[in-house]
Design a protein with these regions (language model features):
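Alpha-helical interface subdomain recognition
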Residues: 2-77, 253-292
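Glycine-rich flavin
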Residues: 43-53, 58-161
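Buried hydrophobic positions in well-ordered alpha/beta secondary-structure cores of metabolic enzymes
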Residues: 78, 153-155, 187, 217, ...
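Short loop segments at secondary-structure junctions
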Residues: 106-108, 147-149, 174-178, 191-194, ...
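Conserved hydrophobic/aromatic beta-strand scaffold that supports enzyme active sites
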Residues: 141-143, 168-172, 186-188, 214-219
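Short beta-alpha junctions and helix-cap segments that line functional grooves
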Residues: 156, 199-203
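A short core secondary-structure module
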Residues: 159-197
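Glycine-rich beta->alpha junctions and the first turn(s) of the following alpha-helix
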Residues: 204-292
Length: 292
């Protein structure tokens, strides 16, 4: 390995270690409200604010935009910590990272939004899944049409994390004039876009605080496609496969891994501390437990 490559790898390792250490340092604070967030379906605003204060909301963005330019490994390890501390916060964070990375890579001219996102001043998310498409989140029945005033969007999106609470949404719809569910175009819609409404509530175990709800679009106007459209017409599927899917899979896997680790830790602590009153023995002293 050449000295220059070795130096680059060493720098990347230091950045990754710093990102993970920063995330670990606030894990207890993230976990403090996790139970209440889930029980009351409370959106983890304070946790998202804390991540922003620590400079983590731009984890994947380049340094020139205020980001950390973190590696995939640092992202996964950090998300695992966040998800294990508060599952709802973990999912909100992952969807935000996926959305802002998509905007960064495929929508020029959004430096202001991206800098705000990195600073924790702008929360973004994805709105791609639909009730009828199952795991095929890239397949869209939602439509777009050209009008005299611009482009209008119609359809419904399911499982929109941070629904009604994010500042912007990366939305997928069929390309203009297309009848194909995978010939799609992506748009960034601001939270106050006319014709965009939200409904329902999410009842996912441990994830009730992430506001993963339904987005309804009714004649939703895109007056300036040049500033709202992500990539070219019909490029949605390509962007979803190349940019969104890898980060979505890595991020959600890390969240659920963190949840599993937290559940295991809680279970171990329970058998170590639970005492049987009639014998005075702890659960972990029982043969059936020790043999597991």
């Amino acid at each position: 390995m050449s000295p220059s490559i070795a130096a680059k790898d060493s720098t990347a390792d230091l950045v990754a270690a710093d990102v993970v250490a920063t995330t670990s340092s606030i894990a207890a604070r993230l976990a403090a409200t996790a139970g209440e967030n889930d029980a009351k379906r409370s959106f983890p605003r304070e946790n998202i604010k804390l991540l922003g204060e620590k400079g983590l909301m731009g984890m994947l963005l380049p340094e020139k935009l205020g980001g950390l330019n973190a590696s995939a490994l640092a992202f996964a390890r950090s998300v695992q910590i966040i998800g294990g501390s508060c599952a709802s916060t973990g999912m909100v964070f992952v969807m935000h990272c996926c959305a802002v990375e998509t905007i960064f890579r495929h929508q020029p001219g959004q430096e202001k939004l991206l800098k705000q996102a990195a600073a924790g001043e702008h929360l973004s998310t994805l709105a791609c899944s639909e009730r009828g498409s199952g795991a095929n989140f890239y397949a869209s029945a939602s439509t777009s049409r050209q009008t005299a005033c611009g482009i209008e969007l119609n359809g419904a999106k399911s499982f929109v994390t941070s629904g009604a609470l994010a500042d912007s949404y990366v939305v997928s719809l069929r390309a203009l004039g297309s009848e194909s569910s995978i010939n799609t175009t992506l748009y960034v819609l601001e939270k106050d876009t006319p014709g965009m409404e939200f409904s329902g509530q999410w009842d996912g175990l441990g994830l009730r605080g992430n506001s993963s709800i339904v987005m309804n679009l009714k004649d939703c106007p895109v007056a300036e496609p040049g500033t709202s459209q992500v990539g070219a017409q019909g490029q949605g599927f390509e962007i979803e496969m190349s940019t969104i899917l890898p980060r979505f899979l890595l991020g959600t896997a890390a969240v659920y891994n963190g949840i599993a680790e937290a559940a295991m830790s809680a279970s171990i602590e329970h058998v170590k501390s639970r005492e049987l009153t009639h014998t005075g023995e702890k659960l972990n002293a029982m043969p059936v437990m020790r043999n597991k």
